[in-house]
Amino acid sequence: MIEIDGSFGEGGGQILRTSLTLSVITGKPFRIFNIRANRPNPGLQRQHLWAVKAMKMISNAETKGDEVGSKELIFVPHEIKGNINIDIDVGTAGSVTLIIQTVLPAIINKNVRIRIKGGTDVPKSPTIDYIRLVYLEILRKIGIEAKLNLIKRGHYPEGGGEVIIENVNGNPSAFSLLELGKLTIIKGISHVSSLPAHIAERQMNSARELLSKLGVPIEIQTDVRQGEVSKGSGIALAAIGEKSIIGADSLGERGKRAEIVGEEAARILIDNLNTKASVDIHMSDMLMIFASLYGGEYIGAELTSHAYTNMEIIKKFLDIKIDVSGKRPFRFKAKIF
């Protein structure tokens, strides 16, 4: 059984999520201890348990320690089950997108349909529009297709969002994403939920003003939803090049003007573009597991603590070589084979 110290590296939920994904894919059981030991509320929290539950259902796994506050978990997977429907409610504003990242690599070609309720646009995780505009589009470039249906948005703290992910299929193989290529267009989605529509317009316009200096077409849509459980706003952007995509997002909050939200996302996007990387900071972390499974190389905008932690966990499950050139927290090249 693979032994994992949950306090290693960034010491958060990423260690658990990566371990769950690779355990289900490889069939290797693991024991993780010191879960989130250095966090203010140590141990498993509800949204972590839903990641465990989802992967348990997918693989018919045996578990021990899967309860709120537990600092140790044993996870023994069996064969991945296909042709199933799974309902997950991560509660209030628990991150829907972190659940998607955990389960998606394990359900390729398995005919699994997952309905996830919780927070679609919450702090400390990619927004659902980033997932749609960037994550899924880059996966398409490496041979993976998925259908994502955003039914309701959920913001912190009320949540109430709902997403369905299904038809995850493909024939992924080794990939090389070493440059963005010529920038062709910037796409985006500026949204509001249960707030005035002009907020989405102001976010869009302020982002557009900064991005116009890049000299490429800009297509930002607005998504205005009234009657949602939670109130909130945000914007996600995708700079689409001939070979890859760079993304960024920003969320509104009480007291934060809509213009600041749009400017913030645009500045993050420009900062990522200026690194000359092939993928942004979010994808630098998320792409590593796919490169580890299928072989791949890419240039990430920043070598984050999440990426570094991911590397060490991946090496416990897979007999691969990870060649990384670059120092935290700067641009880096990853080659995994």
From Swiss-Prot:
Its EC number is 6.5.1.4. One of its GO terms (molecular function) is ATP binding. CDD domains: RNA_Cyclase_Class_II. Signal peptide: none annotated. Keywords: ATP-binding, Cytoplasm, Ligase, Nucleotide-binding. It holds the Pfam family RTC. PROSITE patterns: RTC. GO terms for biological process: RNA processing. It catalyses: a 3'-end 3'-phospho-ribonucleotide-RNA + ATP = a 3'-end 2',3'-cyclophospho-ribonucleotide-RNA + AMP + diphosphate. It comes from the Archaea. ATP binds at Q101, H282, M283, S284, D285. It is found in: Cytoplasm. SUPFAM superfamilies: EPT/RTPC-like. InterPro entries: RNA3'-term_phos_cycl_insert, RNA3'_phos_cyclase_dom, RNA3'_phos_cyclase_dom_sf, RNA3'_term_phos_cyc, RNA3'_term_phos_cyc_type_1, RNA3'_term_phos_cycl-like_CS, RNA3'P_cycl/enolpyr_Trfase_a/b, RPTC_insert. Transmembrane segments: none annotated. Catalyzes the conversion of 3'-phosphate to a 2',3'-cyclic phosphodiester at the end of RNA. The mechanism of action of the enzyme occurs in 3 steps: (A) adenylation of the enzyme by ATP; (B) transfer of adenylate to an RNA-N3'P to produce RNA-N3'PP5'A; (C) and attack of the adjacent 2'-hydroxyl on the 3'-phosphorus in the diester linkage to produce the cyclic end product. The biological role of this enzyme is unknown but it is likely to function in some aspects of cellular RNA processing. PANTHER family: RNA 3' TERMINAL PHOSPHATE CYCLASE, RNA 3'-TERMINAL PHOSPHATE CYCLASE. This is RNA 3'-terminal phosphate cyclase. It comes from Saccharolobus islandicus (strain M.14.25 / Kamchatka #1) (Sulfolobus islandicus).
